[in-house]
Amino acid sequence: MRFEGTSAYVATDDLKVAVNAAITLERPLLVKGEPGTGKTVLALEIAKALNAPLIEWHVKSTTKALQGLYEYDAVSRLRDSQLGDERVKDIRNYIRRGKLWDAFVADERPVLLIDEIDKADIEFPNDLLQELDRMEFFIYETGEVVQARRRPIVVITSNNEKELPDAFLRRCFFH
């Protein structure tokens, strides 16, 4: 698995080295730069070039790290319990998978894009450290552990709107 660019995306030698090092060493690739410089498109082109599925997680200022893992809908469960709905007996009916969960259980090794990570609050990157390192996470409501079948190729973009934590940066290749 090597990325050499595509007909639609001409990559510099430095970028090719960074992408291939991140893939080979199974570490996230952090791509920093101004808006509109092709950072997001890079993940799409890596997926195309490697014939891999692309899973996109577009981060907003209100995004929390847990949303990338899963979301538990306690309000719907409470409402259903008051209405006597049978679904309430299985808490799994109220858990929605996040983008990391989708990437962890994908049949083929996917490219996971975490787009514009610097839009979220300062703790967001640190909140993902363990999950990205260990490639697993715990679902508190069910007591289950979700483990990655295979480590996804992780591409993280940043517009340099704010500094990212050092502990997070140490775990990434960057370009």
Residue ranges and their predicted role:
Residues A11-D13, N20-E26, E34, A103-D107:
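Phosphate-binding P-loop
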